[in-house]
Amino acid sequence: MKVLGIETSCDDCCVAVVENGIHILSNIKLNQPEHKKYYGIVPEIASRLHTEAIMSVCIKALKKANTKISEIDLIAVTSRPGLIGSLIVGLNFAKGLAISLKKPIICIDHILGHLYAPLMHSKIEYPFISLLLSGGHTLIAKQKNFDDVEILGRTLDDACGEAFDKVAKHYDMGFPGGPNIEQISKNGDENTFQFPVTTFKKKENWYDFSYSGLKTACIHQLEKFKSKDNPTTKNNIAASFQKAAFENLITPLKRAIKDTQINKLVIAGGVASNLYLREKIDKLKIQTYYPPLDLCTDNGAMIAGLGFNMYLKYGESPIEIDANSRIENYKNQYRGKNNEKNFSNA
């Protein structure tokens, strides 16, 4: 079965063709550099650019896959969560294709797509612990299947990638913040500033994260945390912030691994491409899986891959389904698309 995957939840316009849930025939992504001068995503600009680009991106994906549009068996599309304008562009485009081609459509949760991405590269047996790190989401989950996901911990404020973006904006390091801070930090001393690392002692927040304190310390209280006579340079700020940002993840992650007694870890999301983070994770000395770099960031392949499996198990989505910018009725457990404990109706 050939699945056309469409992902437009934020600023990347992505279309892919995937066969049988795992064989990637094409995976096309168009970035939107227009946002760089604003140091962040402007929703109105993002949705307009998606409207202008999605047809050509789809044609490129089909051409690279050597596939005619009539040969597509299923259309998978991200319907939540994300920027509502961007989601609507992708969803309406997918609906138009489904209606005109008389093909089924399956709507996919963006978060579950990221959690599925590593399985397209490596054969990983369930259960395992997943760590999702992106500009919009930071969470730890226990996965028993592609549709059986228990959220153990999540950020209580900023996402990890969001904190990188805000620090980078303040110090004029460029957008997006993650890759720029990683590059700038290579020539810095990570011990110049001893920024605070947040860990929670309450049971209900045992696996949760917080980045607001670190962000505030780095932006507004810089000299308070200076511990060496090194100069206050962008390189040293970037290196010290990056160190603290990833140390922030380690304690909740260790707790989750110990308490669940699951020694397999899967890393997903755009921040997973950071090589410094990978060095930190490798020191945990557990079996760890990373998706290739093109599957770390937003992409259509993960939507098509998960869409294949969801369709086989649950069937198609109603054509009337709407885009949703948020995760409704957030619960800690996700089991299938019809379970009352869903954190997604996708």
UniProtKB/Swiss-Prot annotation:
GO terms for molecular function: iron ion binding; N(6)-L-threonylcarbamoyladenine synthase activity. Its main location: cytoplasm. Fe cation binds at residues 110, 114, 298. It is found in: Cytoplasm. Substrate binds at residues 132-136, 165, 178, 274. One of its GO terms (cellular component) is cytoplasm. Its EC number is 2.3.1.234. InterPro entries: ATPase_NBD, Gcp-like_dom, KAE1/TsaD, Peptidase_M22_CS, TsaD. Pfam families: TsaD. Keywords: Acyltransferase, Cytoplasm, Iron, Metal-binding, Transferase, tRNA processing. GO terms for biological process: tRNA threonylcarbamoyladenosine modification. Its cofactor is Fe(2+). It catalyses: L-threonylcarbamoyladenylate + adenosine(37) in tRNA = N(6)-L-threonylcarbamoyladenosine(37) in tRNA + AMP + H(+). Binds 1 Fe(2+) ion per subunit. Belongs to the KAE1 / TsaD family. HAMAP family: TsaD. Required for the formation of a threonylcarbamoyl group on adenosine at position 37 (t(6)A37) in tRNAs that read codons beginning with adenine. Is involved in the transfer of the threonylcarbamoyl moiety of threonylcarbamoyl-AMP (TC-AMP) to the N6 group of A37, together with TsaE and TsaB. TsaD likely plays a direct catalytic role in this reaction. This is tRNA N6-adenosine threonylcarbamoyltransferase. It comes from Borreliella burgdorferi (strain ZS7) (Borrelia burgdorferi).
